[in-house]
Amino acid sequence: MRGGTSALLHALTFSGAVWMCTPAEALPIQKSVQLGSFDKVVPSREVVSESLAPSFAVTETHSSVQSPSKQETQLCAISSEGKPCRNRQLHTDNGYFIGASCPKSACCSKTMCGPGGCGEFCSSNWIFCSSSLIYHPDKSYGGDCSCEKQGHRCDKNAECVENLDAGGGVHCKCKDGFVGTGLTCSEDPCSKRGNAKCGPNGTCIVVDSVSYTCTCGDGETLVNLPEGGQGCKRTGCHAFRENCSPGRCIDDASHENGYTCECPTGYSREVTSKAEESCVEGVEVTLAEKCEKEFGISASSCKCDNGYSGSASATSHHGKGESGSEGSLSEKMNIVFKCPSGYHPRYHAHTVTCEKIKHFALDGAGNHDTTTYVARRRYPASL
């Protein structure tokens, strides 16, 4: 170190490094600070010298950098913003000065920068923040800003995390399955229970500590669930196309599930209690058509038992094929069957049908019907 005036040089050894300090009255316009094999030039500032450096202990800690999210609470900070310790600056191995701030409520020392350091600027990588000692770049510090000292403030369902880089500090982080600031944590609404509501193709997103929303996949729509909350529901032909086979699926937002079926000849559209549509074999016919086509008798011969009501214009599901098939009409439409010549009644459990036993002319033109028609309808077994 060069200088026109006599200067007292103090050489101190600490943690394997050589620290050098010049008393305040001997500072030139610029001073050279030796840190190991590095010579750095720093601007002169007004300083207050200390004849003796304080004694302290350092606890070294090593960890990877973990920055807190916006939701998590930082208990104490190690930052480069220069707030609230604007009179403190940290000298790095790259030769730059950066601002340094202390933990909340801690006061930055105006006169102590560590052994060999004097005044407002530190001539080493040490700075004092009240009882806290922060060391860069080896990522070690002692004092107040540590999980050992601050971690008790975290919620019981949180863990304390140390970030030892500039800009870091100590913060609380809620454990897996919990959300919140870290000071307070509650059960994550997007746990397995929430993801199940969003469906296999949906994604659960936390809104706050008690509510969630879903982003839905293709063919799904966000709906309010009867039991509360939201979920993803399969809608439209993307989800129900196979239901309409062998017919055609048509997207239709006016229907509850976002589609409707267009069924081919010989099939009719059927809607379940869940508002799902499909094409089933058979056609919708009136009661008059049922009497004429299924039983070969006129509509006037069809009548209801005592205690029941109905009309020949009522519609029923008319099927072809298996005898004894069950339909979907109410049992109140209880028809009295009078099988015509060439037919005989066949009784099943709760079902009665008239089966054709030979070719029978349905009209006066001599046309013969060779199809076996079966009533797909439930009736009392007493018939």
UniProtKB/Swiss-Prot annotation:
Residues 67-145 are annotated as: Lectin-like. Adhesin; can bind both the host cells and the parasites. May be involved in parasite invasion by acting as a bridge between the parasite and the host cell. Triggers innate immune responses in mouse macrophages via the TLR11/MyD88/NF-kappa-B pathway. Induces TNF/TNF-alpha secretion in mouse macrophages. Induces secretion of IL6 in mouse and human macrophages likely via different mechanisms. Up-regulates expression of NOS2/iNOS in mouse macrophages. Induces mouse macrophage polarization. Glycans are attached at residue 201. Disulfide bonds join 190-204, 198-214. Removal of the propeptide occurs in a post-medial-Golgi compartment. Removal of the propeptide is required for the host cell binding. The presence of propeptide does not affect dimerization. The presence of propeptide does not affect sorting to micronemes. This is Micronemal protein 3. Its main location: cytoplasm. Residues 294-359 are annotated as: Involved in dimerization. Residues 27-66 form a propeptide. Homodimer; dimerization is likely required for host cell binding but not for trafficking to micronemes. Residues 146-189, 190-236, 237-290 are annotated as: Required for proper sorting to micronemes. Pfam families: EGF_3 (PF12947). It comes from the Eukaryota.
